[in-house]
Every structure is written in structure tokens, then in C-alpha cells.
Amino acid sequence: MSFRDPVPLAQALIRCPSVTPEDAGALDVLAGALEELGFACHHIRSATGGPEIRNLYARLGTEAPNLCFAGHTDVVPPGKGWTVEPFAAGIDQGRLFGRGSADMKGAIACFVAAVARLLEDGAPKGSLSLLITGDEEGPAVDGTVKVLDWLAARGERIDCCIVGEPTNPRKLGDMMKIGRRGSLNCRLTVFGTQGHSAYPHLADNPIPRLLDILRRLTEAPLDEGTPHFQASTLALTTVDVGNPATNVIPAEARAGFNIRFNDLHSGASLERWIRDTVAQAGGEVEIKVEVSGESFLTPPGALSDALAEAAFEVTGLRPELSTSGGTSDARFIKNHCPVVEFGLVGQTMHKSDEHVSVADMEALTEIYRRVLVRLAAPS
């Protein structure tokens, strides 16, 4: 297999049906390719969150700076509606099909190909590494965080990182991510007293109090945004009383909502606001809050500049520096080093007939190679 061409490696990875938490041999395929290029590969296993998860850390070189590429080989289930086999990795009309082609086995293969091309000119300056997890699409408790802990215990550090998520909405070169909004989920349960709907004065209906709480939470914007972040949002995701009867006032009323928040807030500050707002409505209310990630921003600098210039040279487009979208494993890496996200076009990720353009794969390989030349060119 020629590693300077990203397509064969991408096909080999896609043919491993690595639906979270299964690895299905994907990391062995990747490690084999990296070992042929001279990388030292380490397999890190963890099972604190359930089934054992396999992760891979591979490094070429021992000196600083250490430029890392982070990604994942696990994929979401294929689901229904495919017109091709989801793990066959077939090519049709210049498009590589398969679950994980966009998110994100294609980008992993592109980075490996970029490294292979760089090595044709000699050993890189400093070190190159790959941090690849099998637990990004799942709970994300046994993946990237565990590898970062393992690195810290060894005294190894990453100096900057590219995450190969499919950041481009329409065309390669559209967008890179320099941060992400945080995400908070809240479940409210308002307690009352059940009773007959003909005698409401003998019951304590929790529904009006729940509606009052939701009105208080949603009546004003959380903020107006910042130069790099859109305004924070609160989206109601469920309202439920679990009451099929038409003549019974329920004893409980429940609601759930999700907040996507910018760097004007933290999970802790939003939880305080929620609890203070709920308290104003009175009554007995249970509040459960889960923060799956804090907001973060990597200010524009050497890494984003190198990526933007490389993308412009290859595609003619200057990527928008964005913080939109959901969370990614960059939320863990940002505690260790500057991190940006840039990969293939994400229009079909998680959809049936997921695919990427073979031409885009060649272009992304060249973008990554030019970034490596700027930041890690052989002396």
C-alpha cells in the first residue's frame, strides 16, 4: 500500500466496521501504516465507562515541538437508507462511499499521506504524533481524555494540535474551528399534589409552575454573542407530565433543555443562574444539571495562520474562523495546547450514503502537507 495516496488507507479503515465501542481492527490497520513510516505506536486501553475502548498514540521523533493530529476511528451505526454497502468503501463517480469516510477516517488517511510526502524530504523538525481514539462518537470517557492522562503520566506534552473533524459545510476550505461552544443539559421535575380536575382547589397542579419556570428561563437572551462566538442559546427539548387521563391533575411535571454557551459563561455560572431562576418561582423542584463540555477558544495565531494560508493556496478559499456546531474532542485537548479543527466536507456525515470527494482528499492531503512544511519541515 502506498501511503502517499490517502485513498487506499481510507478504504482499509472504512472496511473495518468500527461502530462505537467496537474497534473491528481499525487501529491495527492504522498502526501498521504508521509503523512502516517510522512511528512508535502505543495502544492505550480503558474501560471505566463500560466496554473496553482501544486508543492509539503514535509518535515520530523525540524532540519538541510535538505537532499532533487528533481524531477517531469509531463511527456511528450505519442505519437505513443506504444505496451502497456502508463498509465496502467503494468509489463511484469520484466519490468514496462508506460510514466514516467524512467523519473521520478520510481525514486520518489524508494526514498520514501528508506525513509520508513530508518524509520524502527527510526527518521532520521536532516530532509528529497522532492521537486516535475509539470513543469519540460514544460517551467519550475512555478515549482522548485517557490518552492525555497517559501522556501526562509519561511526561510527554503536545505543543499544538489539528483535529481532523469534517469542519467544512459545503466546500473544502470553507471553515476551520478555533473553538467550540459549551453544552449543558438540564432536567427539571416540578412536584405537586395529584387530584381530580373537577376539584383543582384540592390539588396542587405542578404544570403552571413549570410553565412559569420555563417562561423565566427563556424570556430574555442569555447574551448577544462575542467577536468569535454567536449568542448562547437555550433550547427546550422535552416537556412531559406522563398523564394520559383527562380528569386527573398530575403530581409531577418535567421538562428538559439544552444550553449551548459561549465564553461569557461557564457550566457552573449557568447552573447557578438556573437554580436562582427556579427558586424565584417557588415550590418543590428537582434540578439535575450535566455539563458535557465547557466553551473554549484558541485565539488566532501561528497554527490557524498556517492552516488558513495552506487552505488558501490549495483551494483559493480563506477558511472562516468559526466556533459553531456541537462539541468535539478538541474540548479535552484545549487544556493542553492550542488546537484547531479542519478536515473534509461534512455534508453527509452521519447520513446514509456518507461519502467524500476523492479530489477533496487529495487537496486536504496537500493542505496538511503544507502545514507540516510551515511548522515541521525537515532541517
From Swiss-Prot:
Q: Which residues bind Zn(2+) 1?
A: H72, D103, E165
Superkingdom of the source species: Bacteria
Q: Which GO terms describe its biological process?
A: diaminopimelate biosynthetic process; L-arginine biosynthetic process; lysine biosynthetic process via diaminopimelate
Residues at the catalytic site: D74, E136 (proton acceptor)
- SUPFAM superfamilies assigned: Bacterial exopeptidase dimerisation domain, Zn-dependent exopeptidases
Record pathway:
Amino-acid biosynthesis; L-lysine biosynthesis via DAP pathway; LL-2,6-diaminopimelate from (S)-tetrahydrodipicolinate (succinylase route): step 3/3
- The secretion signal range is none
Q: InterPro entries under this entry?
A: Bact_exopeptidase_dim_dom (IPR036264), DapE_proteobac (IPR005941), Peptidase_M20 (IPR002933), Peptidase_M20_dimer (IPR011650), Peptidase_M20A (IPR050072)
The free-text function statement in the UniProt record for this protein reads:
Catalyzes the hydrolysis of N-succinyl-L,L-diaminopimelic acid (SDAP), forming succinate and LL-2,6-diaminopimelate (DAP), an intermediate involved in the bacterial biosynthesis of lysine and meso-diaminopimelic acid, an essential component of bacterial cell walls.
Entry protein name: Succinyl-diaminopimelate desuccinylase
Source species: Paramagnetospirillum magneticum (strain ATCC 700264 / AMB-1) (Magnetospirillum magneticum)
